[in-house]
Amino acid sequence: MAPQNLSTFCLLLLYLIGAVIAGRDFYKILGVPRSASIKDIKKAYRKLALQLHPDRNPDDPQAQEKFQDLGAAYEVLSDSEKRKQYDTYGEEGLKDGHQSSHGDIFSHFFGDFGFMFGGAPRQQDRNIPRGSDIIVDLEVTLEEVYAGNFVEVVRNKPVARQAPGKRKCNCRQEMRTTQLGPGRFQMTQEVVCDECPNVKLVNEERTLEVEIEPGVRDGMEYPFIGEGEPHVDGEPGDLRFRIKVVKHRIFERRGDDLYTNVTVSLVEALVGFEMDITHLDGHKVHISRDKITRPGAKLWKKGEGLPNFDNNNIKGSLIITFDVDFPKEQLTEEAKEGIKQLLKQGPVQKVYNGLQGY
């Protein structure tokens, strides 16, 4: 073999050995850069989990493997210590670590029984009893509505576990016929039950990840299937988190628009001013006025409102209403005359119906 070909072969061999040692590229699997934040990682997992779930891809023989790779990538990159190990030593450095079930990871985002694709509610068999649904108000800030977030909720969930002994189950009403004599019968209704293994309810700690999507609206619900009240003879109900947006001290939400008030001095109102408003994510919205600003004047800043829930690329407006702070001290006669001379404005005392716009 020629020296040049031998050199190329060795380099290729080293590359292959390195790839095997390095293991899977978890960042590539999740489709995020190595600098990705935990929020980016969670968002990527949630999106891909819906796409790659084996139930959604029954004709793909690699669906299970892809889903397992996705779960492994999330488990490592969502844990700061495991991520540090992975960044330093690759997947080989994690071999001795504990690995979670990928189904457990999935249930943290969607609940115990997965989800119904296409957004349809799960179908309930009328013959199978079902526990009650639980609705929990989840308070979110306007900052979270603007930028999105993942909220971790820890709850103690009652879970049915096997216990010693037997119990009555599947009880139902049945008609019994008793012969009292020739041509005489008596019909009675009795409760008939089957005998089932005994169960007891045990509280187990569950951690759920609720994604607060940008632009989420008050009253929207995020369902977690099978996370509601248990039923010893059937299926548990669902848990639904209902969004409740808390009031903000600076901004008021109306649809996708944000409203706020700015108070300026009388001098600023007359001669103009410049200022910055700190937005919900910390960026500055610059305001520059070189005209007279009247009390109640409004300024529209397009694209500085909240993202639209259905299309985050569309944002509402920021509507700023100006208030003018007049001097609280009385003016001297000399100051009054000076203002009259400066403004050169005579009396304007017009009485009209302001509510009708006349």
Swiss-Prot record:
A GO molecular function held by the record: misfolded protein binding
Gene name of this polypeptide: Dnajb11
Cellular component per GO, a single term: endoplasmic reticulum chaperone complex
Domain of life: Eukaryota
Subunit (UniProt): Part of a large chaperone multiprotein complex comprising DNAJB11, HSP90B1, HSPA5, HYOU, PDIA2, PDIA4, PDIA6, PPIB, SDF2L1, UGGT1 and very small amounts of ERP29, but not, or at very low levels, CALR nor CANX. Binds to denatured substrates in an ATP-independent manner. Interacts via the J domain with HSPA5 in an ATP-dependent manner.
InterPro entries tied to this protein: DnaJ-B11-like, DnaJ_C, DnaJ_domain, DnaJ_domain_CS, HSP40/DnaJ_pept-bd, J_dom_sf
Signal peptide boundaries: 1-22
Sugar-modified residues: N261
Protein's recorded name: DnaJ homolog subfamily B member 11
Purpose of the protein: As a co-chaperone for HSPA5 it is required for proper folding, trafficking or degradation of proteins. Binds directly to both unfolded proteins that are substrates for ERAD and nascent unfolded peptide chains, but dissociates from the HSPA5-unfolded protein complex before folding is completed. May help recruiting HSPA5 and other chaperones to the substrate. Stimulates HSPA5 ATPase activity. It is necessary for maturation and correct trafficking of PKD1.
A Pfam family the protein falls into: DnaJ_C
Localization of this protein: Endoplasmic reticulum lumen
One Gene Ontology biological process: mRNA modification
Protein modification: Contains high-mannose Endo H-sensitive carbohydrates. Cys-169, Cys-171, Cys-193 and Cys-196 form intramolecular disulfide bonds. The preferential partner for each Cys is not known.
Keyword set, alphabetical order: Chaperone, Disulfide bond, Endoplasmic reticulum, Glycoprotein, Phosphoprotein, Signal
Modified positions (Phosphothreonine) in chain numbering: T188
Residues annotated as domain J: 25-90
